[in-house]
Amino acid sequence: GGAGVGAISAEQQDAGSAKGTPVTGSLLIGGLTPCNVIPDEILTDHPKRFRAMLVECANPAHSLADSARMRDALASLDLLVVIDVALSETARLAHYVLPVASQFEKAEATFFNFEFPDNYFHLRRPLMPALPGLFSEAELHCRLLEALGELPAEPIAALRAAWKEGRQA
């Protein structure tokens, strides 16, 4: 463990002038913890260490620079939940795996903003229905938040009704 590249000082953290990770003080990138710092954020003996993770459609146990250390870190978590279409190396370490519909069974969207000033938004309809009991990631998130009592039912019911009604393209 310890302060890594891009770490911020305790004074900066205390002053609130820079946002860093709770254990190593590594700078957040776009508000996110840098992937290669996560093992230290989990394995370091620190009161604010990461104890649980939700991994969505990613395989950090296999795809990062020191995957053996990441596997050790993930295995040491009190709770690891993986949302994925595949039973990846990370999913095999999880306490819970929440399967989701594949890219062919759900609507997906991509926003291309690298062609400024002409930006493009691509929406693709599902090619086939999802298997029973499988949802898109968005639907799964919504159901998790509802189950936790963190999502008011009223706006979601209206959105679901509009979604079911649909409209002609």
Give, region by region, the residue ranges found by the protein language model.
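Non-catalytic alpha/beta scaffold blocks inside enzyme catalytic domains
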Residues: 1, 10-168
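Long, K/E/R/D-enriched contiguous segments that form extended
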Residues: 6-8
